[in-house]
Amino acid sequence: ELKYLSLVLLYIITKKEDVLNCQYCYFIDRPYNRISEMNNFSRETSPKNENLLSVEISCHYKDGTWNLSDQEIYERCIKSIEKDELLKKSDVVNFKILRFPSVYPIYKKNYDDNLEEVNKFLDKSKNFYSIGRQGQFYYGDIDQMARFGFDTADKIAK
């Protein structure tokens, strides 16, 4: 009964630097939700003289967006990116698509009852820890997820 929103990631390799002038930006009314400029996190994320953009597209598993070809996803996104004057298609060196079926928890009515049932079942297992966004059915930030990971490692070490 626990449901997740899926994620399609479009990675765009470009020679253009400072596309966003920030680490990431959220968008509405676009085929994507967020664009992250990886070089603004660290210049070591890309080869010299290249920049990597991560374009995030949330969808439902096997829906119309999920089932688009890699080329169709790219064309749909680059059209909006060009319209916003962030990047020209001619600036793109290459692109790669990755699909993840279960990323963002969907908090439907009574989800907590279903989650409790799952956790009771998992608690019967020894040496099994359900962690991370998917394992805890929790939409937390990366620092929170890292903390949960460290806490779990401490439990295992004891």
Language-model region placement:
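Active-site-proximal substrate-binding core of FAD-dependent oxidoreductases
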Residues: N94-S102, A157-K158
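A conserved FAD-binding loop/helix module that cradles the flavin
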Residues: F128-A157
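Surface-exposed helix-capping loop/turn segments at secondary-structure junctions
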Residues: K83-V93, K158
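Mid-domain catalytic core of redox enzymes
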Residues: E1-L87, L98, E117-F121
